Amino acid sequence: MEALVLHEYARSGNCYKIRLTAAHVGAKLERCEYDIMAGETRTPKFLSRINGNGRIPVLQIGDRFLPESNAACWYLATGTDLIPQDRFDQADTLRWLFWEQYSHEPNVATLRFWFSWIGEENFNEFQRAALPLKRAAGLDALKLMDDHLAKRDYLVADRFGVADIVLYSYTSTCEEGGYRLADYPAVQAWLERVAAQPGHVPS
């Protein structure tokens, strides 16, 4: 495999999920840290060479750059047991990866960032206005996961896979955004199962 470099901000859950996937497949990552709060991903060099979208994580594969965390996780998991062989189960895995970025991360992860990085006392008018809707959408996402996991051990095909890795990252830290894991017993049990997997690494 070509050399892998993870351009990251280590505290980011999107970066952690790539490190976690790499750990499960035994891929060695070189890590390159950026201070997003200082604008290091908005420099002309970063924008022209690494990601014109000005965001991390970016997985560098040799001389090529792959933005978007779930794309990077899928790349690393390809050819391993983390992606099921069945065609429907593969599509269902993608469903969860898309859902995580569309319905889960924008709410659960955003509130973590707002409360843990910015601080409620520093919220601007937009953040204060958006907070109730973000919180409600995050509650809906966690309930959907809890209902789904009440009937099975893992998200797809009842076996551990890349969908579990991707959803583990921000779900495991949701209390930093004001959510209560105790309200979601099936999610709590699932988090414990994922963390008990061989190869698991903490954030």
At which residue positions do the language-model features occur?
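GST-like domain detector, emphasizing the conserved glutathione-binding G-site
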Residues: 1-129
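GST-like fold's C-terminal all-alpha helical module
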Residues: 85-88, 97-196
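Residue-level recognition of oxygen-bearing side chains
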Residues: 71, 186, 199
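Structured helix-beta-strand junction loops
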Residues: 53, 79, 151-152, 197
